[in-house]
């Protein structure tokens, strides 16, 4: 049997898509108003965002435990797989990756753990890249090597409505939030590939300006890597989504779908945020 593909729920691959693609997803925990829920298992992304918008308490998140990883690896092994690739969200953001590595060290399932250095749609595109390689008959070793080589080209651009949640959850400096409020500007942020740090990459007043400034990076990438996949996820942000769609019109890319940002990432970016992800597509040899 071919190797299994495992990811965590911050890849923002919906449960229905995961089932269709034959991908295992381990959920993170979201804690809102004292209730501990499994991301997109016990609460949908849409339900969570609606609840978060009406809550006076800032929700927070927690990684799967070592025991939860063991249970999943046991299930993958019981399904007949001898090996697997696990693609995790950025290890600087969570202990998800380290917990998986800890269990993989002694488990009978041969698990290759890959730190995606990103999250949300960009992580999901890497997962689907691995799946395309598996479907093309590529080996575990080949797939692992190619995914690692592709990591620097998997991009995630986030435009939150405000930086409040990122600051309160320790993902952005407080000064940046204060300055954006004082100057009435919005920031786009993105994970720095080597450090994992969330850094401001663009600024602009109003939705049109911040989207245009942010999409300049995406369009430059598509010019250099035509035919790449682009995925757009949101926690609302209808105006921004329409502006992104307009910016992409006529570009040479593959639409990898739209949908909701999952519960875990939504906790940090807040309501009315948009995530633009892009990554090269796997190209079969023949």
Annotate each predicted stretch with a short phrase:
Residues 49-65, 194-209:
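Acidic/glycine-enriched edge-of-secondary-structure segments
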Residues 10-24, 28-29, 83, 92, ...:
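Mixed-charge interfacial surface used for oligomerization/domain docking
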Residues 45-48, 69, 127:
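A general structural signal for well-ordered alpha-helical segments in protein cores
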Residues 38, 116-119:
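A short, ordered amphipathic alpha-helix with a cationic face
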Residues 4-63:
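N-terminal glycine-rich anion-binding loop in soluble enzyme alpha/beta folds
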Residues 55-57, 63-91, 98-99, 144, ...:
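Glycine-rich phosphate- or other oxyanion-binding loops that anchor nucleotides, phosphorylated ligands
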